[in-house]
Amino acid sequence: LPICLLFSLFSFVYLYVFQRDVLEALHFSLAHGKTTFAPMASALVITLILLLLRWGVNSLLGLKGRVRALAYVPSFLVLCALTDVGRGVYISDYHTPWTWLLPLLVLLFVGIGYWLRGVFRVQLNHEGSLWGLVNSNLAILLGLCLLTVCGGSTNRQFHHELEAEHYLRAGEYDKVLRVGEKSLEASRTLTAYRAVALSRLGKMGDRLFAYPQYYRSDGLFFETRSEERR
């Protein structure tokens, strides 16, 4: 039960707090902007589905004792697939290696796990001390959490772009300008978002050079597909 609660907490916080903008971008791309994204509901529903997936995996493999937490491996793989998103998410022919990699890895895990269950049946039935049981499963869960964080989107500039885009779409132009305002890094896309927000606020002449302008006049416009391929 504690492992279940810890996984639920990690999944919800990771999706709702750290990868919220990535989930929104993925939703916008898949739904073509026709439905409204609900971040909290999405994080809760996904977490619930992942818990059900874990239950199904453990029902199939019967993982016990010190390796019980390994039943969360497919759930963590799904988290990686959902959050390993790059700038190509908005391209009409967007595709990701996770489309074939995720089912392949899950099938491999289930196959190997099913085989190992038969080989180590005696060891699995011997749970040992409670302290050792808890420590072993916590170590597995922590390792899976770290791997998931490393596998998800960690590009700070990309997150800034997505956050600015969210506020721009909502018409909250002041908030667009506060995204990454203390950072000296600024991608061309973020620079263009700031220019649009300043234009809408009628403050471009006053505040344009309050932000880094690494792209000169090109920073006022978004990159075209041909420019991205150079």
Model-derived regions, located:
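Alpha-helical transmembrane segments of polytopic membrane proteins
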Residues: 30-49, 95-109, 134-136, 162
